[in-house]
Amino acid sequence: MVGRSLQGSNRIAGLAEVWRRSVTRLWLLACWLLTVNPANLTAQDSKPVKILVVVSTPTTPADSSAEIFLAGSLPVLGNWAPDGLLLNRQADGTYHGTFEVLPETTVQFKVTRGQWQNVERDADGRNIANRQVVAKPQPDGQPLRIEIQVASWAAEAAVQSTVVGNLSRHEFRSETLGNSRTIFIWLPPDYDQSDARYPVLYLQDGQNLFDRATAAFGHEWEVDETATELIEKNEIRPLIIVGIGNTADRIDEYTMTFDAKRNAGGAGRLYLSFLTDELKPWIDHKYRTAVGRQSTWVGGSSLGGLISLHACLQRSDVFSGCLAFSPSLAWDREQIVAAVSEPHRWPHDTKLWLSMGTLEGGTAESQAANTGRTARLAKLLEAQGLRPDVDLWYRSCESATHDEASWAKQFPAALKALRTVTP
């Protein structure tokens, strides 16, 4: 009865927090709107920008039943679900789709046939970077027209599993968040032959880490291959890696604050509560883990890197280090940078891998902005006492883009940087 009462209390608290978050988001949006001076806005500036995407698919069979989708970074585009926005087939064989966003919003997307196994590719069948467009108001309120030609599609045959080693999957229900997700647990090669306890690395976007068959964009991080190789070479001590699958609420869950420009975000505290108070105790109970903070790290890429930085800021009693690949530092006017800027804000004895590719962004300006933000954060942390390649591993990765293939290349060096798991 006590267990049920506690579960009920947690459930009620979780629902109350979700309600509070919704009210807070509306309040923050209202406050932001009140701060806008109407005198500084034209009618065009204040109206949403309609974007018309026109897709031609010369490699798709001339079949009126074929379905083409946009998968992208907005709720209307499915928050990267592969079947986000269904396009309408026209008489000329092209596919059209429209959606609206606030002016100057940056939108990233790809074209799919409803599954990531059937995502668009270049003419040689290789993966392409996310398409990106900035919503610029058009004369007379006309739609911003984006024309796309799909060069080829990924192979439509069933993708074979690429898992190396002992990987298990579990459906995990969070009472705090009120949703479920897949948890991927990778165990080191000697786990079944030993009674040792192992350090644990928690990584976001778990479906993209181990297996091309589950990876959202057709590429995985090759975490299992990398960890196996480094362990066998005795370059790192064996560890457990937990991949936390994302959900349709990814944007909200991976951000601590509401971003008025994107009209999203702010459930990060709930997500961290799920991670530290629900998932970690379950992992510690089910597996032979070394439970202390010195043996517990957290990491991720993009928004996953952002929430991992916040995890170390908010719960340094749990995590002693962070892997932040291409973190979304621009979120909510660089709120994370402001948080770290407070005197001695970065926790003592908490280490950090921080990397950003030089080609992350759709324009030269956005690429420079991303690398500039990351370099400024690294300098700020060095000024607070973090020593290069001792406490802070900052890397500007030449020609790296914002995708799994780039993060896979960076992962070996990042894993070796973990002093908690090296010999």
Regions found by a protein language model. Name each.
Residues 128-199:
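A domain-start/cap signature at the N-terminus of enzymes
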Residues 192-196, 201-221:
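Short, surface-exposed "cap/lid" segments of acyl-processing enzymes
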Residues 25-37:
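Bacterial N-terminal signal peptides
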Residues 257-297:
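Gly/Ser-rich "nucleophile elbow"/oxyanion-hole loop immediately N-terminal to the catalytic nucleophile
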Residues 210-272:
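Active-site machinery of serine-nucleophile hydrolases
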Residues 355, 361-363, 369-378, 383-423:
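C-terminal catalytic histidine-bearing segment of alpha/beta-hydrolase fold enzymes
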Residues 59-104, 114-136, 169-172:
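Aromatic-rich carbohydrate-binding modules that target alpha-glucans
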Residues 292-339, 345:
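Primarily recognizes the serine-hydrolase "nucleophile elbow" in alpha/beta-hydrolase
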